[in-house]
Amino acid sequence: MNYLNKIRIENPLTICYTNDVVKNFTANGLLSIGASPAMSEAPEEAEEFYKVAQALLINIGTLTAENEQDIIAIAQTANEAGLPIVFDPVAVGASTYRKQFCKLLLKSAKVSVIKGNASEILALIDDTATMKGTDSDANLDAVAIAKKAYATYKTAIVITGKEDVIVQDNKAFVLANGSPLLARVTGAGCLLGGVIAGFLFRETEPDIEALIEAVSVFNIAAEVAAENENCGGPGTFSPLLLDTLYHLNETTYQQRIRIQEVE
């Protein structure tokens, strides 16, 4: 857990432009791993914040016409500052409006990581793809989708699902940790985007090991939380997840991590 240990020591400032539903949970989750979250949204202060920040999360869960230009502006400011961006195109396939905005953002700014479920990532590379809400289609070939998205956007791809797929540096890994309860908590996936951002440390071309550790730390914490005798369901799972992120140690991490490199 080299990266998590570094986070706990250095408390990296992680800027989150995220959706209204998940701000509190995202901030608390970042605090739990040792990062320092800032939910700054004003383009007017972005230049100053981005001089000292370590990464920026952009999550479009509550995209509106009123915040479109702000998102484009902060993404471009992040590029100018050399700040890596984690982009979470929430429900991009659910509407033409979302898909058009995501395409515009990805043309207007360079992101370091695109994170979403298989349906969301597919929607970014296939104009005919649609989706229902934020649910991933379990029948999709996530590895193939991730590889195509990586080739299209020349950026790291993280696809979440029952198994997670990471493609970066022309390498692909499948990770098999996690808990079904993550799908029963609003904002769990959005928090993962923030966690990934917390692991970047101003690396606009992130090391695949950082991405693997970020996703594995989050999902192993979810496993441990779900197995806790006090976990009775989604309501108790959420605070237990935060507690487990806070307490997660190297021994538990190494004992539980399940990862396979794939062609």
UniProtKB/Swiss-Prot annotation:
Keyword Kinase: yes
Co-factor(s): Mg(2+)
Positions that bind substrate: 39, 187
UniProt record similarity statement: Belongs to the Thz kinase family.
Keywords: ATP-binding, Kinase, Magnesium, Metal-binding, Nucleotide-binding, Thiamine biosynthesis, Transferase
Organism: Staphylococcus aureus (strain NCTC 8325 / PS 47)
Function: Catalyzes the phosphorylation of the hydroxyl group of 4-methyl-5-beta-hydroxyethylthiazole (THZ).
Gene Ontology terms, MF aspect: ATP binding; hydroxyethylthiazole kinase activity; magnesium ion binding
Listed CDD domains: THZ_kinase
HAMAP family from the UniProt entry: Thz_kinase
Substrates-to-products reaction catalysed: 5-(2-hydroxyethyl)-4-methylthiazole + ATP = 4-methyl-5-(2-phosphooxyethyl)-thiazole + ADP + H(+)
Pathway assigned to this chain's UniProt record: Cofactor biosynthesis; thiamine diphosphate biosynthesis; 4-methyl-5-(2-phosphoethyl)-thiazole from 5-(2-hydroxyethyl)-4-methylthiazole: step 1/1
Disulfide bonds: none
SUPFAM superfamilies reported in the protein's UniProt record: Ribokinase-like
Amino-acid positions noted as binding ATP in the UniProt annotation, renumbered to this chain: 115, 160
Name the UniProt record assigns to this protein: Hydroxyethylthiazole kinase
GO BP annotations, alphabetical order: thiamine biosynthetic process; thiamine diphosphate biosynthetic process
InterPro entries in the cross-refs: Hyethyz_kinase, Ribokinase-like
Gene3D superfamilies named among the record's database cross-references: 3.40.1190.20
EC number: 2.7.1.50
Broad enzyme group: transferase
